[in-house]
Amino acid sequence: MYEFELINKYFSHLTKRSKSSLSLNEDVFFNKSNKLVVSVDTYVDGNHFINFKKPDLVIKKIIRSSISDLLCKSVKPKYYFLSGSGNSKVFNKNNLIKISKSLKEEQKKYNIILGGGDTVWSNKLSFTVTTIGFSNKIIYRNRSKLVRIYM
């Protein structure tokens, strides 16, 4: 079953009272009255990155991928929340220093701020990033007009 098929079949009915959820078809939550835009992404070792030998590069990839959900909606990201699950082998002192340094670089590059997060002990390495931005409007996927592009 494909992602949107799964969402439509099992979860979209849970959002019927909330226009802000956009029927779960836009990869973001958009509350017009508060100008609030939120997106959540999860990254799992073996699915979204091959290994964690270069944690600094993995962290940059997941931050950039996560903020791109807002950027493609024409929303400037402001805050992000980072949760990580892993064990002491991957979250050792050396890796944590590299992760912290990469996060600082990404924050400076994209003018974003870490708002919080969580850590969980697990044998399976994964990260979840929630991004938050503010905007009067967004670009909707399902309202985009198909245009031919020639290269």
Where are these regions (language model features)?
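N-terminal glycine-rich phosphate/pyrophosphate-binding loops that anchor nucleotide-derived ligands
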Residues: M1-L71, I112, F134-N136, R148-M151
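Glycine-rich anion-binding loops of enzyme active sites
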Residues: Y43, K76-M151
